[in-house]
């Protein structure tokens, strides 16, 4: 009887400890809406809590993605170049997880679906457990973890625990996607002006405190009205989208590109002084110029004019002051013939 009581007390203590851990995990995961930081937080939480050497997350790259792709911040897995690590949203596994929520091994998935066809990327990882992330009845990610450090199998209690972590992760990802929707321009997939301003203010404060450089670019599509007037607004929309793609491909991790309004864009370049900002601007300008846009049998060329400004704490008392300097430099680029970059003095 005494042994049973002791065992019961130990079990309750374990449950209380797990609940406290889950509370701390929930606080941690919901402390950020930055998608990349959130993914890192989820994976490191799994590594530590489950005592595993490998962890990865299949997630959507953006709101319109038709598949879940293995996020680049995976931990411990050795990837092969000849394998596409993705799971189509329409794959039966996603539907299965929607109606039968729980973590499974690869063998359990094979038995449940009949085969692993279409899951070659998942199978190549050889995960010990596959765990769906489900929020509001929708699968928004698939977590994979490798073998335990001790080498033994996961117990039923551990499976339940990792599902609880997955539930918290799913809610955090759902919140991050909602934030993404409210801060992203749906046409260009770039950030909106109001979000750009918010981040710029934070970066300016950090640059002033840490005495680090910071620059902004203002960019405008040359003769944009001609595309609308000559070919119609659908052509103008395509030009905006294609220009945005070049911007996204040209910026570095940590940079921020946004649609400022109409055919005008802005970029935030942390740890970058004015001359280096001009180099980045020129890379963007040349990239846009080299990009040929096909529209209804025609090949269209696009150019942009750019204004750059390096942050000066003695002059730039507000975000508007800094952006106004970049905007004036943009105006000079247009005055001097367009398709060029001008640095604000």
Language-model features, listed with the residues they occupy:
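Signal-transmission linkers at sensory-effector interfaces
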Residues: 1-31, 36-37, 188
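GAF sensory/regulatory domain recognition
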Residues: 44, 56-89
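Acidic/proline- and glycine-rich, intrinsically disordered low-complexity segments
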Residues: 78-104, 109-110
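Signal-transducing coupling segments at domain and membrane junctions
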Residues: 103-127
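A short, aliphatic-rich beta-strand micro-motif
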Residues: 126-134
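Conserved long alpha-helical elements within nucleotide-processing catalytic cores of c-di-GMP signaling
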Residues: 194-204, 208-215, 225-252, 258-262, ...
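Catalytic-core segments of nucleotide cyclases and related cyclic-nucleotide turnover enzymes
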Residues: 278, 311-344
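Catalytic core regions of nucleotide second-messenger enzymes
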Residues: 286-304, 334
């Amino acid at each position: 009887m005494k042994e049973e009581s002791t065992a019961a007390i130990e079990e309750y203590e374990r449950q209380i400890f797990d609940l406290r851990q889950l509370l701390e995990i929930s606080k941690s995961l919901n402390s950020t809406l930055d998608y990349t930081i959130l993914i890192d937080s989820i994976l490191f939480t799994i590594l530590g809590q489950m005592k595993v050497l490998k962890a990865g997350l299949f997630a959507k790259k953006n709101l319109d993605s038709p598949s879940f792709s293995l996020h680049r911040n995976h931990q411990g897995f050795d990837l092969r170049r000849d394998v596409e690590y993705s799971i189509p949203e329409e794959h039966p596994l996603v539907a299965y997880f929607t109606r039968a929520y729980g973590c499974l091994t690869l063998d359990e998935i094979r038995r449940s679906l009949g085969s692993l066809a279409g899951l070659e990327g998942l199978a190549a990882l050889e995960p010990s457990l596959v765990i769906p992330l489900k929020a509001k009845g929708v699968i928004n990610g698939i977590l994979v973890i490798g073998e335990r450090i001790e080498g033994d199998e996961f117990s039923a209690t551990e499976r339940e625990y990792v599902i609880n972590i997955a539930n918290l992760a799913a809610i955090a990802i759902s919140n991050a996607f909602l934030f993404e929707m409210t801060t992203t321009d749906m046409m260009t997939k770039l950030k909106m002006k109001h979000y750009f301003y918010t981040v710029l203010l934070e970066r300016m404060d950090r640059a002033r405190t840490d005495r680090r450089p910071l620059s902004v670019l203002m960019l405008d599509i040359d003769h944009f009205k001609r595309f609308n007037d000559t070919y119609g607004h659908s052509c103008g929309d395509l030009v905006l989208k294609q220009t945005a793609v070049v911007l996204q491909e040209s910026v570095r991790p940590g940079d921020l590109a946004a649609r400022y309004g109409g055919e005008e864009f802005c970029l935030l370049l942390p740890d970058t002084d004015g001359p280096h900002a001009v180099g980045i601007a020129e890379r963007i300008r040349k990239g846009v110029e080299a990009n040929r846009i096909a529209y209804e049998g025609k090949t269209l060329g696009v150019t942009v004019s750019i204004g750059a400004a390096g942050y000066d704490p003695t002059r730039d008392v507000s975000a508007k002051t800094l952006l106004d300097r970049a905007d004036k430099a943009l105006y000079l680029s247009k005055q001097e013939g367009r398709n060029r970059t001008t640095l604000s003095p």
